[in-house]
Amino acid sequence: AGSIKHGLEIMGLALVDVHANTCMMLRAHQTPSTKELKLRDMNQVKHYIDVISCYKKDLRKVTDVIVADAFFSIRTFVDGIKEHEFHLVSRFRDTADLHYVYTGPRSKKPGRPKMLDGKIGYKELDFTRMEKLHIEGLEGSAYTLIAYSKALKQKVRLVIWIMPNGKHKLFFSTKTSMSGEDVLYIYRSRFQIEFCFRDAKQFTGLTHCQARHKNQLDFSYNASF
């Protein structure tokens, strides 16, 4: 009952004000069914990239950062939005393959310069390579560094949040110039979109439309938002 049924879900594209902690829905798109995606010779992630590309001109006037949950922390999506000049703020799985970046002197030996300097072990973190973050209201402790993601094949601004129970969460931005504080603030602000969905369901009939035609459904979703 709680599983995702492609073709019966919608993708919401919204603008979030991190400082005011508010959200405004811009557009909703119905996710194509698996059959329709197959006919288009694309997958769900490619569909999401195409939707973003449709609004990139207007979005780029406001921001160059897209925030999304861990589902989108894959190379296909990161590379796809990079083509449209967007960076991603998201979360890695807790066991992500991440490496310290080598910052020492360049060797005079021939060949490719050394880039990686050991895998990040989450049970034995090297805090000398990190900067501790001081974030009001955050339980536990948080550290930031520039790390290399094997999955994304690129450097990222990484934030490691160590919770009071000893477990950790990994947040990142593909915009390495972004501060660790901003990575956390931006990722946490993405939950504001849930209030847009909640209000549309409770007050403006988001789930009440019984139409079957795609255009009618599209109008109903966006009118609700």
Predicted regions: what they are:
Residues 209-225:
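Basic, amphipathic alpha-helical segments enriched in Lys/Arg and hydrophobic/aromatic residues
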Residues 1, 13, 65-72, 88, ...:
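Short, conserved catalytic/metal-binding motifs centered on acidic residues
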Residues 46-50, 170-176, 181:
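Short, motif-level signal for alpha-helix interfacial/capping segments enriched in acidic residues
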Residues 1-28, 158:
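Acidic, metal-ligating active-site segments
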Residues 180-211:
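Short amphipathic alpha-helical "interface-anchor" segments enriched in bulky aromatics
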